[in-house]
Every structure is written in structure tokens, then in C-alpha cells.
Amino acid sequence: MNSSKRYERTLVAILFFTWGTVFLDRMSPLYLAPYFAPELHLSHAQIGTLASVLAITWAGSTFFFGALSDRVGRKRVLIPAVFIFSILSWMTGLAHSFHHLLWIRGLMGLAEGPTWSIMTALIEESSAVQRRGRNIGFVVSAAALVGLAAAPVLTTQVAARWGWRSAFFLAGVPGFLMGALIWKFVKEPAHEENESHEKPTLRDYVSLLRFRNMWLCCLGATGFMSWLFALNVFAPLYITEVAHQPATTAGLLLGATGLGSFFLGFLLPSLSDRVGRKPVLLVSAAMSAFIPLAFLVPIFYVYPFLLAAIVFVTNSGQGMASLLMVLVPTESVPPQFRATSIGLATLVGEIFGATAAPIVVGNLSEKYGLSLGMWMAAAGSAVVFMVALFLRETDQHPESHGGSPQFSR
């Protein structure tokens, strides 16, 4: 493991902006839909389908290509993926029909999926043990800062001035730069001394589910993704249609959640380096449940800045992602399965949380109202909390384990 602080800082900086670019490309269609939907004559259902197809292909590719990178190396898979999703962002700007967009977004999910499992595995492998949580948390928090806070402003401002096609072209540019930086500066991690050099078999991959923490993380990832997408899809509608607040208030509240997620997404995994993964995950899950519940309290809308402050200090979603989908899985399995473990947790979470949960909530909300979306988001956090109660602690500080990883089934 390369534990040089200088290299760690370089790696973390490059992958921070790369992950931010990935989420910029993933979230851009949600923000640009009001611009391209009328031109391409898209229905609300078709816009939702575009998001779902990307989630499905992302889920499969993050597992498959993560496992492939465990066998052939990280950079051989990551660099082509970064360049391909950047090209596909440009191609989105050339689309002239729903079917064009459907194919392009599906292919983009295939290209972007590997970046999650491979980049987080790179950080985990190249960081000193006492800085793993901090480094993972910082990189993962880029999704909140770029994808949830900066992307809505950047893409809509460009679309308003030069059109939605120009916004997609602009969103694709950073990926080419980050791909070049990864090629030049990122090193292939060295094998650990205790790591087997034999190629894993199919039976070895299936055996990952024998690890208690692994299947618990899959369940927790489903709860986290349900919380994330139920909140982000239905909170804007609830605030404007049920709470009868102007769109500017919705923007203020959602912007506050995005910024809060960035800061807590960095701080909480860093704290887990000191006190352990399990207690921080318990606190993160409990805090995140407050956000959808706060949106249900009418009196808070009389004081919108107070509500913004509440959701700012309680949005620990990115912290949950770092712990549930990266740190705990990779610390629970043998080193040669790190990217595979990340991909497996993400696969289950994307399918049952990111894809299925919004569809179920959307259909039920037609009958029971949009408040159901907030209750379902809170329920997702409750699932994460329950999972955390049964997790085995994976903090592997040298002073705790004599410097040798221990894997418990």
C-alpha cells in the first residue's frame, strides 16, 4: 500500500473532482428536463424512465466491472470508463427523441457504474489505515457538493442562455480532463503481502455473501438508496404542492440539504476513523431520518431559514454511503474482493432502492398523498439504523489488531 501523504492528497483531489463530475453527468437530466422535455415531447413517465434505466445499468456495471478490476487492475477499467461517459454526455446533447436518450442514458450507466466501485477501492487501498474514513468521506461528499449543490445552478444557467444541448456538452468537458489526470498521476495499487495472487473463482465471489457484514450492507444500501431517492424525488413536490411553498423556498431547503450532506459526508467518516464505523453509522441513520420528518411539520415553513438550518445539520446521507457501501464492505472481506464488495452492495441498493422504491412510492402517493414519500424516506433511514445494530465493527487500526486485517463471517 502506498501510504505517502503527498500521493494520498493528490489521489484524493483527483478522485474528488472525478466523482463530482460523475454525479454532474448523472443528475444533469433531472435539472434540464424542463428544457428538453417540451422540445422532445416527453411525458413525466418517460423522464422517470430515463433515470431508472441509468440506475439499472449502473447497478450491473458497478458490480461486474468492479469484479473485473479486482482481476486486471484498477486503471485498465477506470480510465476508459471516464472517457466513455464523457463522450456519452456530449451525445446526450445530440439526441432528438426519447429512444435516443434512452439508449444513451443506459450506456452512460454502464460507463459510470465502474467509477464508484473502482475509485472508492483505489482510495481504500492507497490510504493509510488511520485516514481511510477521512479520505473516502471526502471523495464521496463530492456528489453532494457538485451533483446536488453546484449542478442545478450550473446546468440551468447554461441552458437558459445557450440551450440545454450546450449544457450537456459543458457537463462532458471535465471528464476528459479528469481521465487524463488519472492516467498520468494515479498509480496502480500494490498487492498487500498477505493478499493471494491467485485469480478468484466464481465460487469465491459467491462466498462473499457468507460474510455477515456483506449481506447486512446490501440490506442497508437498499434502505439508504430508498431514503436518498424518495427524499430527492418527492420532497420538491411535497414542499410546493402540499406545503404550498414557492419554488424559491424549495430551492433554499434542497440547497441546504446538499451543502449539509457535503460537510457531514466528510466529517462523519473521518470521525469513524477514531471511534469506529458502527457508532457513526447509527448516529448518521438517526440524523438523516429527521430531514423528511421535518418537512412534514407545517410550523417550520413559517420560519424557512430555521428549517434550512435543521436539514443542513442533519443530512448525513453521504456519510451513510461511505460507511455502508465502501468502508464496512471492504473491511469485511479479503483484500482481493474490495471492489467486488463495493459493487455488490451498490448493485442491491441501486436495484431495490434507487429503481424500485421511487416507483412504488410514486404509485402509492397517487392514492395516499405525497406525504407518504417523506414517511418512506424516514423508513429507509430506520432500515439503516436497524442494520447498523447488527453489524460487526470493522475498524482495523494497527493498534487494535496488530496491523493485520481480521475478517469475520
Q: Model-derived features: where do they sit?
A:
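Glycine-rich segments within core transmembrane alpha-helices of 12-TM secondary carriers
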Residues: 134-152, 346-356
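Conserved MFS/SLC helix-loop-helix module at the cytosolic interface between two early adjacent transmembrane helices
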Residues: 60-96, 272-275
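Helix-breaking motifs and short loop linkers at transmembrane-helix boundaries and internal kinks
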Residues: 41, 73, 94-100, 244, ...
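Extracytoplasmic gate region of multi-pass secondary transporters
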Residues: 29-30, 213-262
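Helix-loop-helix hairpin linking two adjacent transmembrane segments in secondary transporters
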Residues: 139-184
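Flexible cytoplasmic inter-helical loops of multi-pass small-molecule transporters
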Residues: 184-204, 397-405
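Cytoplasmic helix-loop-helix junction between adjacent transmembrane helices
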Residues: 104-143
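C-terminal transmembrane helical hairpin of 12-TM major facilitator-type secondary transporters
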Residues: 278-328
